[in-house]
């Protein structure tokens, strides 16, 4: 019996036994090598470590799940394997990849698996912030070292900046001189434009065209900034801050040579020549135009070379005092190196080097001021331009609608199409003077051109014996979208009246009617529309119905009131008021008239509960009136008890007069009258002494007396 050892095992080390089929071998047969059974169809990717079928791209290489997990555990747990005893050259296969872990980890690293790609789990925020700060500081130090190496070489820095300016700028001295000579020889002046230099006739351009005209120029400034040594070492935020703040300044320095002071004009980007006086001064732009030409004349008088312009543009862009910068130290170093290069070039080309450099650097505040003013003007121009384009689109849409309506009318009326085709033009109110003037000029031109055609048409029709009158479409009304529309005009409808040039085919009568219609005053449609609607509407309710609706109680109280009135009507023995005998009220006592029960209709009191209650209540009286009423009632009771059967004689004092009629009706009525002295000073009643009451006579038969209501 023979033990088969692994081919890569060493002496003295016991390994696991081989499979059963290879464990006992006859002395005749030799030992077989292990076979790999992997189906390979031409698209299968194998593991770079063990040769097994790869499951994906893990930690930088194609590997299987076993090698991926082995490498992750080894790195995360920081396992130190025992060194290999076979010269660290073990063969790592699928069937024996677990035998030597040291060589397996070594092969994983050798084929390209990255230690940094392994995640270590959740990192605390403080630890993560510390790691990021350390990484940023190390990156910043590396950038500073590289920038120092680039900026310390002065001649190389100077050459790179000048070459970048010549490669990215289209307006060098030679090219601008050729453009200026061509513009002077064959001047092509642009139309009057808004106060936006270097851009002719912006009112005829869209915002997209205006942006495309400056796109390549702005792109040149951005490319120039990227070619400055040390600019690529800045962060994205610092790059954006520098370009946003200094882009227009550098662009203005590049285009300063386009201003021609002797001719008092400017060469536009399209090669046209624009006079200074042709620039409109709207929106307080005259100060901007004058300041721009003055600054351009000042800069052009210095006669800067291309190298000086390139270095000056770099200094304008790389400025350390821009708000929002993070790496200010690197920007300051770049600015100082660029300034020293400019000083070197000025010293080589000019005799007065320091004074000229000082004069050139003094222009930076004025340049920033002009840049700010120009940016504000561009914002205003953009707003006005959008409004102008919107108005133009509105006019075009209105024209298309009128054209469609005219075509429909002509299709309906073949006779009217002959005469009204010339009078289908409409007049529109424009919100801007420029647009109004343009449209007015266009109408005048069309009207002048159509006079001859109209005259020929009239002559031809008159020769043939035809009289054609224009067919005018009826006025159109715009009906309000209302769910309760009653068909009543509200007074807000606007008549869409077609106004056009007078047609040559119209008869004298129709022309007179048109003139009379034009002279007729048109009332404003928006003058008190609610009042007009109310006056035009017919009355919906009469007064009684309106009052019933206004004082209509809730539905649950209506049934209660109906029941109450039905019970009151059905109650037996209800007293009916008797006819009142004539009485003689005194003219000086209107506050105490004789009262009688008021018949109130059931439906009215039921529907007007509050009103009926207020009418049935007695009026509120002052204390003096209450006292007087009590005295009157006392005298009334005395009169009833002490009055004779036939009548009551009038007393000398005459305060009360009792009339008793001889009517056979059993219900006598007592009329009271208070005599008021006709003297100037009223005499009060003396109630201190009580007169002895007479002996009571036999009581008369009891009669009904209606209740007295106080006045």
UniProtKB/Swiss-Prot annotation:
Belongs to the nuclear hormone receptor family. NR1 subfamily. Residues 591-602, 682-692 have a biased composition (Low complexity). Residues 574-590, 693-711 have a biased composition (Pro residues). A zinc finger (NR C4-type) spans 47-67, 84-108. InterPro entries: NHR-like_dom_sf, Nucl_hrmn_rcpt_lig-bd, Nuclear_hormone_rcpt_NR1, Nuclear_hrmn_rcpt, ThyrH_rcpt, Znf_hrmn_rcpt, Znf_NHR/GATA. Keywords: DNA-binding, Metal-binding, Nucleus, Receptor, Transcription, Transcription regulation, Zinc, Zinc-finger. It is found in: Nucleus. Orphan receptor possibly involved in the regulation of genes in the ecdysteroid cascade. This is Ecdysone-inducible protein E75. Signal peptide: none annotated. Residues 405-432, 466-530, 559-602, 680-711 are annotated as: Disordered. Its main location: nucleus. Pfam families: Hormone_recep, zf-C4. Transmembrane segments: none annotated. Induction: Expression is induced by 20-OH-ecdysone which initiates and coordinates the molts. GO terms for molecular function: nuclear receptor activity; RNA polymerase II cis-regulatory region sequence-specific DNA binding; zinc ion binding. The lineage of its organism: Eukaryota, Metazoa, Ecdysozoa, Arthropoda, Hexapoda. Residues 511-521, 560-572 have a biased composition (Basic and acidic residues). One of its GO terms (cellular component) is nucleus. It comes from the Eukaryota. Residues 44-120 bind DNA. Residues 153-400 form the NR LBD domain. It comes from Galleria mellonella (Greater wax moth). GO terms for biological process: cell differentiation; hormone-mediated signaling pathway; negative regulation of transcription by RNA polymerase II; positive regulation of transcription by RNA polymerase II.
């Amino acid at each position: 019996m023979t033990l088969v050892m692994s081919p890569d095992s060493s002496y003295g080390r016991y390994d696991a036994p081989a499979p059963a089929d290879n464990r006992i071998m006859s002395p005749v047969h030799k030992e077989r090598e292990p076979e790999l059974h992997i189906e390979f169809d031409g698209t299968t990717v194998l593991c770079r470590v063990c040769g097994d079928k790869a499951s994906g791209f893990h930690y930088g290489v194609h590997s299987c799940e076993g090698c991926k997990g082995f490498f992750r555990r080894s790195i995360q747990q920081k396992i130190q394997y025992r060194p290999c005893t076979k010269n660290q050259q073990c063969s790592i296969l699928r069937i024996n990849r677990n035998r030597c872990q040291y060589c397996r980890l070594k092969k994983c690293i050798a084929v390209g698996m990255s230690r940094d790609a392994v995640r270590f789990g959740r990192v605390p925020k403080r630890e993560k912030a510390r790691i990021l700060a350390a990484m940023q500081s190390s990156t910043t130090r590396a950038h500073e070292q590289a920038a120092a190496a680039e900026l310390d070489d002065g001649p190389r820095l100077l050459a790179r900046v000048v070459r970048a300016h010549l490669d990215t700028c289209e307006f060098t001295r030679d090219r601008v001189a050729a453009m200026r000579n061509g513009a002077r020889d064959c001047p092509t002046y642009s139309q009057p434009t808004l106060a936006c230099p270097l851009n002719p006739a912006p009112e005829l351009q869209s915002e997209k065209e205006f942006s495309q005209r400056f796109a390549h120029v702005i792109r040149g400034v951005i490319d120039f900034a990227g070619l400055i040594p040390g600019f690529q070492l800045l962060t994205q935020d610092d790059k954006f801050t520098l370009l946003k703040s200094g882009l227009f300044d550098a662009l203005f320095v590049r285009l300063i040579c386009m201003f021609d002071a002797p001719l008092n004009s400017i060469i536009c980007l399209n090669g046209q020549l624009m006079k200074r006086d042709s620039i409109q001064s709207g929106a307080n732009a005259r100060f901007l135009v004058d300041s721009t030409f003055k600054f351009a004349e000042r800069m052009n008088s210095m006669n800067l070379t291309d190298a000086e312009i390139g270095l000056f543009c770099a200094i304008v862009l790389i400025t350390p005092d821009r708000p929002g910068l993070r790496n200010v130290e690197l920007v300051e170093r770049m600015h100082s190196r660029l300034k020293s290069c400019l000083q070197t070039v000025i010293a080589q080309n000019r005799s007065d080097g320091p004074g000229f450099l000082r004069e050139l650097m003094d222009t930076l505040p004025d340049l920033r001021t002009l840049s700010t003013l120009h940016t504000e003007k561009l914002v205003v121009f953009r707003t006005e331009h959008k409004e102008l384009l919107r108005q133009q689109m509105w006019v075009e849409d209105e024209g298309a609608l009128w054209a469609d309506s005219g075509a429909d009318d002509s299709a309906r009326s073949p006779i009217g199409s002959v005469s009204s085709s010339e009078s289908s033009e409409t007049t529109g109110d424009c919100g801007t003077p420029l647009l109004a003037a343009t449209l007015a000029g266009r109408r005048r031109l069309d009207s002048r051109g159509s006079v001859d055609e109209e005259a020929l048409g009239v002559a031809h029709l008159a020769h043939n014996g035809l009289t054609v009158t224009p067919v005018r479409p009826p006025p159109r009304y715009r009906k309000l979208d209302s769910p309760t529309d009653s068909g009543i005009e509200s007074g807000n409808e606007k008549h869409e009246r077609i106004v056009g040039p007078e047609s040559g085919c119209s008869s004298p009568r129709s022309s007179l009617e048109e003139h009379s219609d034009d002279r007729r005053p048109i009332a404003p449609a928006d003058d008190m529309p609610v009042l007009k609607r109310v006056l035009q509407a017919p009355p919906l309710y009469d007064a009684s119905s309106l009052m019933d609706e206004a004082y209509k109680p809730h539905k649950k109280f209506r049934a209660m009131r109906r029941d109450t009135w039905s019970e009151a009507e059905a109650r037996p023995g209800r007293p009916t008021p008797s006819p009142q005998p004539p009485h003689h009220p005194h003219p000086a006592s209107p506050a105490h008239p004789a009262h009688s029960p008021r018949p109130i209709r059931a439906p009215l009191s039921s529907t007007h509960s509050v009103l009926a209650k207020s009418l049935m209540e007695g009026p509120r009286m002052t204390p003096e009136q209450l006292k007087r009423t009590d005295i009157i009632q006392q005298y009334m009771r005395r009169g009833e008890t002490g009055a004779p059967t036939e009548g009551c004689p009038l007393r000398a004092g005459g305060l009360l007069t009792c009339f008793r009629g001889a009517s056979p009706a059993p219900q006598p009525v007592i009329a009271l009258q208070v005599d008021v002295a006709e003297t100037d000073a009223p005499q009060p009643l003396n109630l201190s002494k009580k007169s002895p009451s007479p002996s009571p006579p036999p009581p008369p038969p009891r009669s009904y007396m209606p209740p007295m209501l106080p006045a």
